[in-house]
């Protein structure tokens, strides 16, 4: 009887339909969970149509700042977890470009080397902002103008490091960040390292420049370049935050990506291979505007990036902080930042003409081309047991 019932077409259709319904229900729930996991939830609501001036509330900050390295006469209470001076969305303007003298005048509390400590309370985080740089003076001034008041309202102890690549060779963003991390950690035991592109300006001071002890944070989740959304789940570009331990656990960033493209995906793969997970602020908080610019000479598209990405699983323990070499040419304490100039060498592979049409790096056409050429990441194997601690000593 049961056998004949199961053999009827209508019964089989009913069973198959029930299974599909259950699978769809579970899948929808799974996608909702993944959405929350990757930070695509909108989070709190902010009105970006009425931003505040980026220098709002600075006059309300208490007292004179504590000079870097100085000890207060008596123990101070910790600053609140969320500063009362935050204003939410702030206006970001690219014109006119302020002079360095104007920025210094607007930020009298900033100490030499771009250092700041809040007065009246002990900062909960000591954050080093590390900016790779070459031939982007206007972008750098815009970043300094917006970032200093932004960070002061968050009541952080911070320092800004600008890492300048000497010479005219191909630009290497990731290697410059490794240089900046090493030099910054020689100055102070920073709690948090913010790796920050020079052309990205934050639009919401609720986007706190602090690290997540659970794992690396990707902070620039909603750029105007991508329509204020995450371009793909593994994206780790623009602005990211790691504790020194997290940075060393993944052996820092790769040194072999000369030119534009590829290093962000290598870094995201390193996070996974080191047994960590990426966290993100809500989309409504992690807003950034990118300063418009043309393609940079010396930062052309990297034709080797896909070959390098295929090897990341096997190369990440050998290419990074433990293989970093450079010559420190200058380390100067300017009024708004610590300037580090380094000779990081040149691409040993030399130039190679990329296949297909060439678009300006960072353009929408270049991004689409990269998505079409992107190879699927290799499956992660067992984690290596190598010692990931960067050696101390010579460069």
From Swiss-Prot:
Intervals, Cytoplasmic compartment: 1-10
- According to the UniProt topology, which residue ranges lie Lumenal? 32-395
List ligand-binding residues for N-acetyl-D-glucosamine.
262-265, 305
Question: Does the record bear Transport in its keywords?
Answer: no
User: Per UniProt, where does UDP-alpha-D-galactose bind?
Assistant: 132-136, 171-173, 198-199, 228, 260, 293-295
> Is the keyword rRNA-binding in the record?
no
Q: Name one GO molecular function term.
A: beta-N-acetylglucosaminylglycopeptide beta-1,4-galactosyltransferase activity
Cofactor(s) in the UniProt record: Mn(2+)
Please name the pathway.
Answer: Protein modification; protein glycosylation
Q: Which residues cross the membrane?
A: 11-31
What's in the keyword line of the UniProt record?
Disulfide bond, Glycoprotein, Glycosyltransferase, Golgi apparatus, Lipid metabolism, Manganese, Membrane, Metal-binding, Signal-anchor, Transferase, Transmembrane, Transmembrane helix
- Residues with an annotated glycan are 57, 339, 387
Its GO biological process terms? carbohydrate metabolic process; galactosylceramide biosynthetic process; protein glycosylation
Q: Where does Mn(2+) bind?
A: 199, 293
The disulfides recorded in the entry are 79-121, 192-211
The UniProt catalytic activity note for this protein reads:
an N-acetyl-beta-D-glucosaminyl derivative + UDP-alpha-D-galactose = a beta-D-galactosyl-(1->4)-N-acetyl-beta-D-glucosaminyl derivative + UDP + H(+); N-acetyl-D-glucosamine + UDP-alpha-D-galactose = beta-D-galactosyl-(1->4)-N-acetyl-D-glucosamine + UDP + H(+); a beta-D-GlcNAc-(1->3)-beta-D-Gal-(1->4)-beta-D-Glc-(1<->1)-Cer(d18:1(4E)) + UDP-alpha-D-galactose = a neolactoside nLc4Cer(d18:1(4E)) + UDP + H(+); a beta-D-glucosylceramide + UDP-alpha-D-galactose = a beta-D-galactosyl-(1->4)-beta-D-glucosyl-(1<->1)-ceramide + UDP + H(+)
**Purpose:** Responsible for the synthesis of complex-type N-linked oligosaccharides in many glycoproteins as well as the carbohydrate moieties of glycolipids.
What family is this? Belongs to the glycosyltransferase 7 family.
Name-wise, this protein is Beta-1,4-galactosyltransferase 3
What is the species listed in this Swiss-Prot or TrEMBL entry? Cricetulus griseus (Chinese hamster)
The opening ranks of the lineage are: Eukaryota, Metazoa, Chordata, Craniata, Vertebrata
- Identify the gene encoding this protein: B4GALT3
């Amino acid at each position: 009887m049961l056998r004949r019932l199961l053999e009827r077409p209508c019964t089989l259709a009913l069973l198959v339909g029930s299974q599909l319904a259950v699978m769809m229900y579970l899948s929808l729930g799974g996608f909702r969970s993944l959405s929350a996991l990757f930070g695509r939830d909108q989070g709190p609501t902010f009105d970006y149509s009425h931003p505040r001036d980026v220098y709002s509330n600075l006059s309300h900050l208490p007292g004179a700042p504590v000079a870097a390295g100085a000890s207060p006469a008596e123990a101070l209470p910790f600053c609140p977890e969320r500063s009362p001076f935050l204003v939410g969305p702030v206006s970001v303007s690219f014109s006119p470009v302020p002079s360095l003298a104007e920025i210094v005048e607007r930020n009298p509390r900033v100490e030499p080397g771009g250092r700041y400590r809040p007065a009246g309370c002990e900062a909960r985080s000591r954050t080093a902002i590390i900016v790779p740089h070459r031939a982007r003076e206007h972008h750098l001034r815009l970043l300094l103008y917006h970032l200093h008041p932004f960070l002061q309202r968050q009541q952080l102890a911070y320092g800004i490091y600008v890492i300048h690549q000497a010479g005219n060779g191909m630009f290497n963003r990731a290697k410059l960040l490794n240089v900046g991390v090493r030099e910054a950690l020689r100055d102070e035991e920073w709690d948090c390292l913010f790796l920050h592109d020079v052309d990205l300006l934050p639009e919401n001071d609720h986007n706190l420049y602090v690290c997540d002890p659970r794992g690396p944070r990707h902070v620039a989740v909603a750029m105007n370049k991508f329509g204020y959304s995450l371009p793909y789940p593994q994206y780790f570009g623009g602005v990211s935050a790691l504790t020194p331990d997290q940075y060393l656990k993944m052996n820092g960033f790769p040194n072999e990506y000369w030119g534009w493209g590829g290093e962000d995906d290598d870094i995201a793969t390193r996070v996974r291979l080191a047994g960590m997970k990426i966290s993100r602020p809500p989309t409504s908080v992690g807003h950034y505007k990118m300063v418009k610019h043309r393609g940079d000479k010396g930062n052309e598209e990297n034709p080797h990036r896909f070959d390098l990405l295929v090897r990341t699983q096997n190369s990440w323990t050998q290419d990074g902080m433990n293989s970093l070499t450079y010559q420190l040419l200058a380390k100067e304490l300017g009024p708004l930042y610590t300037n580090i100039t380094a000779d990081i060498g040149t691409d040993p592979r030399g130039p190679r003409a990329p296949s297909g049409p060439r678009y300006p790096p960072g353009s929408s056409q270049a991004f689409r081309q990269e998505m079409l050429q992107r190879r699927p990441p290799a499956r992660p194997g067992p984690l290596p047991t190598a010692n990931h601690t960067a050696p101390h000593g010579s460069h």
